[in-house]
């Protein structure tokens, strides 16, 4: 699970930062999932080493232009390139109408390659490896935060140990590999987890933008490895944040602290903090770290690979 930031500016692009988009790379399944798709996202993809042919899902937080104006261009380009796999879109009410209107008036036709799903709080997507859930944040229009959770993986099955215990190969090995408990014909009870190496705990991250400080963000981010949270304003501009329902750097840090996350990565910075201005994003970083030290600043094309965690529980079986 590798995260790549394709756009980290709020509202409008700057010379150094494009508007919102984050890519989640899943190399084990040759897929890319996008979170938001602001104007110019496909150009950012071309400047990265991400393959658009692997684009499989796009999750939209809300319908403000800096989060969706890149959708149609990207989808159209995928169609022209002859991408084989479909692209599923998930987002708030109105997303499907937006896509249909753009398609109608631009005479762009996707056929069955693009499916749009309207989300509501709760489970958004699940397969054998991942679950994606969402909930409403606090913004001027309906905006959803997303939580992506990788399911735990059973550790490597110790075949030699199984043989030494006289467990016959076959279907029973498959059950033990899954961590199941089985009873042998001689009456012995064997726990699969005792024949497997350390469990690989599933990795988790949350994506919360746009929002002012809210309890929902804390709930979505509870215990995640990485929280990506907007930090549009500096603390001294908190009045603007409350007025426009955006977050300050200190609000993002407070969410991270309350949720007990491992790492906070701030993004969605106002252009007012561009280099050369009285305050820049390094000031926002200092403010956040005073509350939550494990904080990083996102920048365009910043990559972060979420590390795996293992829980040691290999037990000798007699």
From Swiss-Prot:
Residues at the catalytic site: 66
Binding site for Zn(2+) 1: 62, 64, 139, 210
A UniProt-annotated Pfam family: Lactamase_B_2
Residue numbers binding Zn(2+) 2: 66-67, 210, 268
UniProt remark on cofactor binding: Binds 2 Zn(2+) ions.
Signal peptide location: none
Enzyme class: hydrolase
Quaternary context: Homodimer.
Cited function: Zinc phosphodiesterase, which displays some tRNA 3'-processing endonuclease activity. Probably involved in tRNA maturation, by removing a 3'-trailer from precursor tRNA.
Protein name: Ribonuclease Z
Taxonomic source organism: Gloeothece citriformis (strain PCC 7424) (Cyanothece sp. (strain PCC 7424))
């Amino acid at each position: 699970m590798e995260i790549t930031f394709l756009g980290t500016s709020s509202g409008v692009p700057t010379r150094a930062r494009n508007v919102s988009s984050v890519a989640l790379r899943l190399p084990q399944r040759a897929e890319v999932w996008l979170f938001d798709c602001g104007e110019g996202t496909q150009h950012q993809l071309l400047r990265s080493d991400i393959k658009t042919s692997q684009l499989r899902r796009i999750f939209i937080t809300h319908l403000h232009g800096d989060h969706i104006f890149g959708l149609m261009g990207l989808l159209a380009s995928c169609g022209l390139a002859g991408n084989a796999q479909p692209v599923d879109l998930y987002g708030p009410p109105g997303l499907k109408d937006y896509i249909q209107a753009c398609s109608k008036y631009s005479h762009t036709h996707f056929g069955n390659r693009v499916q749009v799903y309207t989300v509501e709080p709760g489970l958004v997507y699940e397969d054998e490896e991942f679950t994606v859930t969402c909930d409403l944040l606090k913004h001027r229009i309906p905006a959803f935060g997303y939580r992506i959770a990788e399911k735990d993986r059973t550790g490597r099955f110790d075949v030699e140990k199984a043989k030494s215990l006289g467990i016959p190969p076959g279907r029973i090995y498959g059950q033990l590999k899954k961590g199941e408990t089985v009873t042998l014909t001689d009456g012995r009870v064997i726990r699969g987890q005792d024949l497997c190496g350390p469990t690989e705990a599933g990795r988790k991250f949350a994506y919360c933008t746009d929002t002012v400080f809210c309890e929902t963000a804390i709930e979505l981010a509870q215990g995640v490895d990485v929280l990506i949270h907007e930090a549009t304003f500096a603390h001294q501009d908190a009045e603007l944040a409350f007025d426009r329902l955006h977050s300050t750097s200190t609000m993002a840090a407070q969410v991270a602290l309350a949720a007990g996350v491992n790492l906070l990565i701030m993004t969605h910075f106002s252009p007012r903090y561009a280099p050369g201005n009285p305050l820049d994003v390094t000031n926002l970083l200092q403010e956040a770290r005073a509350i939550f030290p494990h904080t990083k600043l996102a920048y365009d094309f910043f990559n972060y690979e979420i590390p795996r965690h293992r829980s040691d529980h290999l037990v000798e079986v007699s």
